[in-house]
Amino acid sequence: MAKTDFLTADMTRRQFMKISGKSLAGLTLSASMLSLFGCSQKQVDSGAVATWALPQGLLVVNADLCTGCQRCEINCTLTNDGVCSSYISRVKIQRCLNLDGAGNGLLSGNDNCFVYFPDTCRQCEDPACGNACPQKAITTNEQGIRVVDTDKCIGCGACHEACPWHMPTVNPETGKSSKCIACGACVAGCPSGALSIVDWDAVTSAAQAAYMDL
């Protein structure tokens, strides 16, 4: 795939939303944006770097820095559920372990080695999870985040099945579905820097710096 000149001119939040949850492979980032994301162009080219558009900024994932320690999952569930549980975590690492050799649906592995890639909700503009919910329990809050109304949720799992990435997860203890609410707990729990959130002002400044350097 031919590279696209990326972030060397105006880059809007809407444009980032179009590539939210996708690898940046095939895109050429400016030096200022590479510095902001804490990655190299080589890592971008390899598909190791992806971004998620959140209300507070960009969630940047660098798979090359992920050790698979699962602390992001632990911090997520401790913060939101008061328990340690990879299964109900809103950020997914445990399913990337490739224990059965089946892959994770995102990356096929490298020389039969494990490939760790933190994955989470894309906050889709037209969410399949919400559309599939028979109780209309998944709505959009004032920040633009898709949230589950646990009073309406019946734990049927329709949201999980409808999501192309199977992100919503029904808690077997509560019988309620949960999904990412962009709280940032996963980032706070990451010891390796594989997860980071870059605020929108910094993204805008880096894009403007790239434009000025042309």
Predicted features along the sequence, with ranges:
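C-terminal segment of N-terminal export signals and the immediately downstream linker at the start
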Residues: A31-N75, A209, D213-L214
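Primarily the internal scaffold of c-type cytochrome electron-transfer domains
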Residues: V198-L214
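N-terminal export leaders
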Residues: M11-F37
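N-terminal secretory signal peptides
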Residues: M1-Q15
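Short, intrinsically disordered, charge-biased short linear motifs at domain edges
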Residues: T51-D64, L106-D111, F117-R122, W165-N171
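Iron-sulfur cluster-binding cysteine motifs and their immediate structural context
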Residues: K42-V44, R71-I93, D126-I154, A158-S178, ...
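Mid-chain, structured segments of secreted extracytoplasmic proteins
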Residues: V91-P127
